[in-house]
Amino acid sequence: ELIWFLFIMKFRKLIISLLGTALLTSSVGLSTTTASADTLDDSQNTTEVQPKNLKWAYPFKANKKNGVRPMYNAQTFGITNYMRSTTPPSYFHDGWDFGFSEVGHSNVYAIHQGTVKKVAYGNGLGWFIWVISPDNYVEVYQEGFNKKKDIYVKTGQKIKLDQKIGKLTGSHLHLGVTQTNKDYINKYGFPCKNWNVNNGTWLNPIEVIKSNLKK
């Protein structure tokens, strides 16, 4: 009987040991699986897909019907016949001016989707809308709004292509287009650096719009 009792006790210890090992293995396997899932989720959350071929549009309805027909050379982008600065002497225009005589006091529409970085007032800019787009383009709508109430969007707001963002109440709307990798922000934090320097900072807005114009 003693031998039988010792045999049962030894067998009992073996069973307990095997059960403990099985539970430990199961627990470790579960932890490993959970960790792998967390790692996968983190990887998915941090993966950014850069948008491609985002559409462009003109800022005024009249442009969609009649195209862009500036009345003066000084309204166009690039080297013009109008001196804009004397030190250094420069005839360079860093954007495109849409005059009241062409488009009237009409609504201004977003030429590209993006997020409003700032709505503010600046010397030489007037009230302006500064937009950063997901494809790293930058759009600045300036000089066309006499008062803040003429602007219909606010800082941090996401805007869509062709969304109404304001109303032209001044003599013209100056439209500037650049990219986030360009040196376009001046020491005061305004989006107008190199405004009188033809060094590639500013792009021709009309050419950019026509490159992928929404039909």
Where are these regions (language model features)?
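A structural signal for short beta-strand/turn segments enriched in small hydrophobics and glycine
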Residues: 114-116, 153-168
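Short, surface-exposed secondary-structure edge patches
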Residues: 105-108, 148-157
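Short, Lys/Arg-enriched N-terminal segments with co-localized hydrophobic residues
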Residues: 1-8
